């Protein structure tokens, strides 16, 4: 069973990732490119030796959206996913790929019976939190009509970039400048961190980061990283001890943070970066 992908390259398309610099690629807006990227999956059931379920899903989608199809396919309860015996959290597929860096594609996962996920509530709450971080309140998202609120989540389910953009512009085009940029940095844990770190675990660093420096110049990614994690990022200009991955590829430290958020945030509004040690 399969769904043909629009593109199975799970990396961020751009000059920083070594993607081809073709006229058509250069003319495609980055958000549209990101919405078109897909991740191929090879899913087996923990309690049944049926043929694997093969499918490609958008980077911006969620594994939980596959559960009805998987339950019907295997005829057994399906509610949780594992990668190498690590239970996966309810995060966007692309972010999970960046976190766990599967050695090969399709990504081999095991589905089974476990904790159930309410993905719609998870997405909505995360989007509200991002709105609060941006503006100091959640008035923008709370003022959306029920129709627009529903359309936002439906667009994620349907991987509909055009419909999503119509609603998302209402959230990003505010009368006042943003107070902060919603940013989360995911740092893989190791036994050396605590002595007993769970395999596959990670910690999330989330600070209030202004899109502008005190001199009103744009805040860059490098400056934000140095401010949030100075031990890992002693330089604001270049990666020295660690780098960050966004949508499968590195990002220039000189990138303006607000512009990066507007162009490459996940649909819930968060700029999610994964640390990779050098």
Curated annotation (Swiss-Prot):
The keyword Magnesium does not apply. Residues 1-25 are annotated as: Disordered. One of its GO terms (molecular function) is Atg8-family ligase activity. One of its GO terms (biological process) is protein transport. Pfam families: ATG5_HBR, ATG5_UblA, ATG5_UblB. Conjugated to ATG12; which is essential for autophagy. Conjugated with ATG12. This is Autophagy protein 5. The gene is ATG5.
């Amino acid at each position: 069973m399969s769904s043909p992908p629009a593109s199975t390259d799970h990396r961020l398309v751009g000059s920083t990732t070594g993607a081809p610099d073709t006229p058509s690629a250069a003319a495609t807006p980055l958000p549209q490119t990101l919405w078109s990227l897909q991740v191929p999956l090879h899913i087996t059931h923990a309690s049944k030796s049926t043929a694997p379920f093969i499918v490609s899903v958008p980077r911006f989608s969620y594994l939980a959206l596959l559960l009805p199809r998987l339950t019907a396919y295997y005829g057994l309860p399906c509610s949780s996913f594992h990668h190498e015996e690590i239970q996966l959290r309810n995060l966007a597929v692309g972010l999970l790929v960046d976190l766990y860096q599967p050695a090969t594609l399709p990504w081999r996962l095991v589905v089974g019976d476990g904790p159930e996920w309410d993905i719609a509530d998870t997405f909505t709450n995360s989007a509200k939190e991002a709105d609060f971080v941006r503006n100091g309140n959640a008035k923008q998202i709370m003022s959306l009509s029920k129709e627009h609120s529903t359309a936002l989540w439906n667009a994620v389910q349907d991987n509909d970039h055009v419909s999503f953009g119509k609603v998302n512009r209402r959230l990003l085009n505010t009368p006042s400048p943003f107070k902060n940029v919603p940013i989360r940095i995911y740092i893989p844990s190791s036994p050396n961190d605590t002595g007993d770190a769970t395999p596959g675990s990670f910690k999330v660093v989330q600070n209030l980061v202004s899109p502008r420096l005190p001199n009103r110049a744009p805040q860059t990614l490098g400056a934000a990283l140095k401010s949030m994690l100075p031990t890992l990022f002693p330089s604001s200009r270049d990666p020295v001890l660690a780098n960050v991955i966004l949508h499968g590829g590195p990002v220039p430290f000189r990138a303006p943070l607000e512009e990066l958020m507007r162009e490459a945030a996940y649909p819930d509004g968060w700029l999610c970066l994964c640390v990779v040690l050098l």
